[in-house]
UniProtKB/Swiss-Prot annotation:
Chlorophyll a PD1 binds at residue 198. This is Photosystem II protein D1. Chlorophyll a ChlzD1 binds at residue 118. It is found in: Plastid, Chloroplast thylakoid membrane. The lineage of its organism: Eukaryota, Viridiplantae, Streptophyta, Embryophyta, Tracheophyta. The chain crosses the membrane at residues 29-46, 118-133, 142-156, 197-218, 274-288. Residues 345-353 form a propeptide. It catalyses: 2 a plastoquinone + 4 hnu + 2 H2O = 2 a plastoquinol + O2. A quinone binds at residues 215, 264-265. The record marks 161 as: Tyrosine radical intermediate. Photosystem II (PSII) is a light-driven water:plastoquinone oxidoreductase that uses light energy to abstract electrons from H(2)O, generating O(2) and a proton gradient subsequently used for ATP formation. It consists of a core antenna complex that captures photons, and an electron transfer chain that converts photonic excitation into a charge separation. The D1/D2 (PsbA/PsbD) reaction center heterodimer binds P680, the primary electron donor of PSII as well as several subsequent electron acceptors. Pfam families: Photo_RC. The gene is psbA.
Length: 353
């Protein structure tokens, strides 16, 4: 015992710091990824809160027409947002010291770039920290793999899409109505609803919600009764107990009779793998779709593809979507474009008579 105490005393300050950082006995695990995660996420969160409350209007389109996004400049929780960095900045790295003054930095939307870049670094480190803690505890690494789906989605809308479009001004605004505006403009310019990767993402999110609700309700409904009929089944259990609290055979039998036998899992591991993989793979595909549409590889275009024997167009749902896309296209950034791209691309009629 004495030798152990002496060895601890002789350990260097750096060694003690390393042991503290990587200790799984801390109430919250820090880890080496946490050393980078904590300051980046604190910075992103602090600047977001300050900018959401008090940032002045931002010249998002680079045409000297600032757009207000903060609460003190007339917005509420729904309409407020951190306005993306100006199109005049493009993809340039724009820290505070690159601007002539803080006022110029705010006018050009510097906070957006600061928040987004720190946030992406922070969530990537959070993913690494999940792996690191799993490694220290001897667990398998799939928690971090599952978290890679939302990380990929955030990276797609905040970094890959602006890179593909040539400006951070095309990134998703950090606010509720700003997110909706981003979605509408994305549909107008890329026809995302007709992209198969987006369809897979919808199936992943809605299917994941359905399977989660089905699984949770089925487990809760098939508890092994440890009590009498006169008291709650909840009284028969204690939090964190080692014994199984529900009967998977009973759940399998119920679900197999409700639908059909092979629609029900009789193996808990394969069931939970399915519950994790379904939404994760769907969101991976959506992030991949956003990242390809960033470079204008857009959704399917079936416009005016059905005609009768006389060559007259028979409108399909695709044509209705196309008309809606044109309407959204001409309305967004209305002062920045003399000719919206979709309309300007049409060949002008001949005037030679």
């Amino acid at each position: 015992m004495t030798a152990i105490l002496e060895r601890r005393e002789s350990e260097s300050l750096w060694g003690r710091f390393c042991n503290w950082i990587t200790s799984t006995e801390n109430r919250l695990y820090i880890g080496w990824f946490g050393v980078l995660m904590i300051p980046t996420l604190l910075t992103a969160t602090s600047v977001f809160i300050i900018a959401f409350i008090a940032a002045p209007p931002v010249d998002i389109d680079g045409i000297r027409e600032p757009v207000s996004g903060s609460l003190l400049y007339g917005n509420n929780i729904i309409s407020g947002a951190i306005i993306p960095t100006s199109a005049a900045i493009g993809l340039h790295f724009y820290p505070i010291w690159e601007a002539a003054s803080v006022d110029e930095w705010l006018y050009n939307g510097g906070p957006y770039e600061l928040i987004v870049l720190h946030f992406l670094l922070g969530v990537a480190c959070y993913m690494g920290r999940e792996w690191e803690l799993s490694f220290r505890l001897g667990m398998r690494p799939w928690i971090a793999v599952a978290y890679s789906a939302p990380v990929a989605a955030a990276t797609a809308v905040f970094l890959i899409y602006p890179i593909g479009q040539g400006s951070f001004s095309d990134g998703m605004p950090l606010g509720i109505s700003g997110t909706f505006n981003f979605m509408i403009v994305f549909q107008a310019e890329h026809n995302i609803l007709m992209h198969p990767f987006h369809m897979l993402g919808v199936a992943g999110v809605f299917g994941g919600s359905l399977f989660s609700a089905m699984h949770g309700s089925l487990v809760t409904s098939s508890l092994i009764r440890e009590t009498t009929e006169n008291e709650s089944a909840n009284e028969g259990y204690r939090f964190g107990q080692e014994e199984e609290t529900y009967n998977i055979v009973a759940a399998h039998g119920y679900f197999g009779r409700l639908i059909f036998q092979y629609a029900s899992f009789n193996n808990s591991r394969s069931l939970h793998f399915f519950l994790a993989a379904w939404p994760v793979i769907g969101i991976w595909f959506t992030a991949l779709g956003i990242s390809t549409m960033a470079f204008n590889l857009n959704g399917f275009n079936f416009n005016q593809s059905v005609v009768d024997s006389q060559g007259r167009v028979i409108n399909t749902w695709a044509d209705i979507i196309n008309r809606a896309n044109l309407g959204m296209e001409v309305m967004h950034e209305r002062n920045a474009h003399n000719f919206p791209l979709d309309l300007a691309a049409i060949e002008a009629p001949s005037t030679n008579g």
